[in-house]
């Protein structure tokens, strides 16, 4: 049996990237060069202003030893939590079977 724990307000995965770089003693500039992206791109992800794309997830997998799947799941969980927080503003009616 699989147990899934849902976080109500998960952090943006960029926070984990920033924490990981600090633990490793790697600057944002050095990490960006190693990832083959600009410093600004990495800064935007760490600051939570940009999402982790599948390509970025694969780059992180190669650089940090984590899996691309993990990064994408974290991003999806963050995005879904943000949407759920404003779900009441999305006006959708449930589909009902057509009366025959």
Predicted feature residues:
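Hydrophobic side chains within well-formed alpha-helices
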Residues: 13, 67-68
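Short, basic-rich loop-to-helix N-cap that marks the start of a DNA-contacting helix
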Residues: 49-62
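Residues within the alpha-helical elements of helix-turn-helix
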Residues: 23, 34, 63
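The DNA-recognition helices of helix-turn-helix-type DNA-binding domains
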Residues: 38, 49, 64, 75-78
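Short, charged recognition helix plus adjacent turn
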Residues: 70-100
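Short alpha-helical DNA-recognition segment
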Residues: 26-44
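A short, Lys/Arg-rich alpha-helix, primarily the initiator
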Residues: 2-26, 73
């Amino acid at each position: 049996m699989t147990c899934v724990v849902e976080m109500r307000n998960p952090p943006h995965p960029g926070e984990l990237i920033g924490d990981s770089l600090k633990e490793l003693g790697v600057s944002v500039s050095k990490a960006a060069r190693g990832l083959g992206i600009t410093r600004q791109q990495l800064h935007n992800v760490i600051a939570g202003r940009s999402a982790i794309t599948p390509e970025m997830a694969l780059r992180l997998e190669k650089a940090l030893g984590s899996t691309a799947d993990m990064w994408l799941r974290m991003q999806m969980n963050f995005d879904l939590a943000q949407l759920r927080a404003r779900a009441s503003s999305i006006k959708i009616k449930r589909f009902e079977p057509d009366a025959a």
